Amino acid sequence: MQTKIVLFNQNDVEKVWPLAVEMIQLACDTNGGFDAKDVLAACKKGTFQLWLIVGDNDKVYASVVTEVRNYPKIKVCDIKITTGVMYKRWFHHIDDIAAWAKEQGCKKMEVFAR
C-alpha cells in the first residue's frame, strides 16, 4: 500500500479539517499548550501548516502540523504535531517535510515530542 503526503493551503484547511481534527485534538490533549481550535485558527491564518498523510485507499494515516519560524539568525521549521496510526507506513514522509522546509529557506528542523 502506498501513502502520500499532502500540504494544504491555508484557504483549504477548513475543508479537510474534519479528517484531521480528532487526531490533532488527541495530540493536543497530551501537549496542553493549545487545542484543536487553536491549531485550526493558526492554520487558517497561515501561521501553521497542515499536512495529511493518506493511503491509496483514501484513509488518513497521519496529521502533521508545522510552523516556519524566523529567529534573528536562522529560519527553522518546527514540527508541532505528528500524530497518526501505523507509523511504519508513513513516517518516511517526514523527509518530504524536511525537503519542503529547505525550499522555504529553513536551515534547521525542530521537533516537539512528549
Regions found by a protein language model. Give the residues of each.
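Active-site rim helix/loop that mediates acceptor-substrate recognition in acyltransferases
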Residues: C28-L50
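Charged interaction scaffolds used for protein-protein
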Residues: I5, K45, W51-I53, D96-K102
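Conserved donor-binding loop and adjoining core beta-sheet/short helix segment
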Residues: T47-K88
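Polar/charged alpha-helical tracts
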Residues: N11, P18, K37, A41-K44, ...
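Acyl-donor binding region in acyl/amide transferases
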Residues: P72-R114
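Residue-level detector of functional hotspots within protein domains
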Residues: F34-V39, S63-V65, D95-I97
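Short amphipathic alpha-helix that is part of the acyltransferase structural core
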Residues: M1-F34
